[in-house]
């Protein structure tokens, strides 16, 4: 992310997000069913500006032990919306090289709820928990953007998607310096949203054709209702005559 911003000044900001698969346990030891957890850089709060019920999202994402949860997650698992101060135990696995072999080692970490996101508000994204993403964890993705990482670019006023995309693929100095392989493509978030691609779990997916069809049906029903109203009104008027 830092490399791209330095190489291309039209990129105003970049937010990196990682799909973090972990088991969640409450302070009581009770295991919480699957929830979508994403580790994100603190500027997530600035780029997406989700509505909050409580807490400071940016400060929470700066805190390695802080976690932000959604309203629906809090209500479903705690029976109330404001659960600031509650603790969650996140259990995951990390790979370490030992005796020439990669081994999975279980790791546990306690997080404190420091922000509540109002997921009733409109958003392109879907998640249950947001936690801090250390810069060291996404060092590889600064240039490759792979391994379940999402990179969201914010362009400045003079920035254009097509021009930046061309630069990314033609700037030999940048590509050689960071060993870029293959073609890099940029997609507007709204385009991904309406693509109907169910494989992108972090971004909500809507089928544009289905939305148009539903809208057309709604308009047709409204038109029919209007005609029926007019016919009934005319019939009553004729009866009075």
Predicted regions and their residues:
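Short, glycine/charge-rich beta-strand/loop segments that flank catalytic centers
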Residues: 15-23, 63-64, 87, 92
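Structural preference for long, well-ordered alpha-helical segments in enzyme cores
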Residues: 1-4, 90, 167-171, 216-219, ...
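N-terminal membrane-entry
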Residues: 201-221
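Glycine-rich loop motifs involved in handling phospho/adenylate chemistry
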Residues: 58-62
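Membrane-helix interface segments
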Residues: 31, 160, 208-209, 239-241
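Mid-to-C-terminal secondary-structure elements
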Residues: 38-54, 66-206
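Short amphipathic beta-strand/extended segments in non-transmembrane regions
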Residues: 1-54
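Intracellular coupling helices
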Residues: 227-241
């Amino acid at each position: 992310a830092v490399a791209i911003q330095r190489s291309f000044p039209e990129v105003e900001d970049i937010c990196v997000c990682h799909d973090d698969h972990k088991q969640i346990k409450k302070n009581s030891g009770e295991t919480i069913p699957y929830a979508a957890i994403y580790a994100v850089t603190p500027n997530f709060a600035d780029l997406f500006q989700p509505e909050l019920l409580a807490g400071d999202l940016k400060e929470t994402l700066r805190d390695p032990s802080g976690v932000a949860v959604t309203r629906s997650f809090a209500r479903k698992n705690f029976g109330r919306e404001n659960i600031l101060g509650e603790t969650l135990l996140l259990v995951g696995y990390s790979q370490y090289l030992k005796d020439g072999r990669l081994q999975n080692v279980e790791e546990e970490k306690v997080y404190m709820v420091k922000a509540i996101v109002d997921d009733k508000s409109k958003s392109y994204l879907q998640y249950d928990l947001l936690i801090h993403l250390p810069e060291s964890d996404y060092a590889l993705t600064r240039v490759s953007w792979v391994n379940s990482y999402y990179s969201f670019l914010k362009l400045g006023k003079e920035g254009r998607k097509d021009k930046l995309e061309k630069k990314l693929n033609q700037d030999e100095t940048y590509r050689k310096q960071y060993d870029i392989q293959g073609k890099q493509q940029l997609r507007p978030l709204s385009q991904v949203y309406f693509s109907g691609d169910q494989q992108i779990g972090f971004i909500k997916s809507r089928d544009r054709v289905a939305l148009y069809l539903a809208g057309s049906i709604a308009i047709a029903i409204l038109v029919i209702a209007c005609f029926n109203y007019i016919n009934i009104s005319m019939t009553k008027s004729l009866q009075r005559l």
